[in-house]
């Protein structure tokens, strides 16, 4: 699991480097098309026997997962890597809430306490001016909420579809969606506030292709290692260890030139990590 967290942070580091010259929308496209190729090969070798029947929920999982990933990649390119990863790691907190709201799962007192701690942590990191949050903070929070909604849908979808099909829905939308948006971007005037959603394709050059491959390989390796970890030990232990991603991201981000987080940001990160521990160990 530590290796999964490290490779995940490596992916984030190279995505951040690519984000200085390529739009996050394009990085999202390349990250997903790599995964689509791998999953299609796996399905060809061993066809699925899913019973299906929940197409729109499957599409929703792909669509919301794509938007969450896009928001995440955009933030990695524009704010410190450790902060972007911390926002994304709020997903277990929102997952506990959505599982209670949509699936009728119990919301124990520890989970309620975790939600409160997580909210305080978000406020300390975002430092809102009154009720106003920056675009980066809003997208960071959405990356956690969107991921949680995607995970919530998986709990229902796994009764109808092979895990590979569920993952393919996410990566397919995450490939086709950016492609459409990049084509549309050539025919519209892009509002600066929507630059995370619309961007013109920029042909990668030289070493950027190597970075793109690393992002794809690291993302796939991280997913495989995490899945393996869940089969070898208790989910609570694995879930707790995933928060080392924040530490790895802080280190890699600092190496890449990120500003070291201030006192309030560190406290906010600590509260979100503590909240995550409370949720995954409930």
Residue ranges and their predicted role:
Residues 110-127, 264-281:
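Hydrophobic transmembrane alpha-helices of multi-pass small-molecule transport proteins
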Residues 1, 53-63, 107-120, 136-142, ...:
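Cytoplasmic-side transmembrane-helix entry/capping segments in multi-pass membrane proteins
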Residues 13-16, 24, 39, 132-193, ...:
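Transmembrane alpha-helical segments that form core, pore/gating elements
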Residues 5-13, 40, 62, 66-70, ...:
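Hydrophobic/small/kink-forming positions within alpha-helical transmembrane segments
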């Amino acid at each position: 699991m530590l290796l999964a967290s490290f490779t995940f942070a490596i992916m984030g580091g190279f995505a951040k480097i690519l984000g200085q010259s390529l739009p996050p929308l394009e990085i999202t496209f390349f990250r997903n098309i790599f995964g689509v190729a791998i999953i299609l090969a796996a399905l060809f070798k061993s066809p699925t026997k899913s019973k299906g029947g929940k197409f729109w929920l499957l599409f929703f999982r792909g669509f919301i997962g794509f938007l969450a990933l896009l928001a995440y990649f955009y933030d990695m390119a524009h704010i410190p890597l450790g902060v972007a990863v911390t926002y994304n790691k709020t997903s277990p907190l929102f997952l506990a809430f959505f599982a209670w709201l949509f699936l009728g799962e119990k919301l124990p007192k520890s989970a309620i306490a975790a939600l409160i701690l997580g909210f305080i942590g978000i406020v300390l990191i975002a430092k809102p001016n009154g009720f106003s949050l920056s675009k980066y903070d809003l997208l960071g929070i959405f990356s956690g909420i969107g991921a949680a909604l995607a995970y919530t849908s998986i709990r229902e979808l796994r009764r109808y579809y092979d895990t590979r099909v569920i993952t393919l829905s996410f990566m397919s939308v995450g490939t086709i969606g950016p492609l459409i948006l990049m084509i549309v971007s050539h025919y519209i005037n892009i509002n600066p506030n929507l630059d995370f959603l619309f961007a013109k394709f920029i042909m990668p050059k030289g070493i950027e292709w190597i970075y793109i491959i690393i992002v794809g390989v690291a993302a796939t390796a991280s997913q495989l290692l995490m899945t393996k970890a869940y089969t070898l030990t208790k989910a609570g232990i694995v879930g707790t260890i995933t928060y080392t991603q924040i530490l790895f991201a802080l280190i890699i981000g600092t190496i890449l030139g990120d500003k070291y987080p201030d006192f309030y940001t560190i406290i906010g990160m600590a509260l979100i990590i503590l909240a995550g521990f409370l949720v995954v160990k409930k």
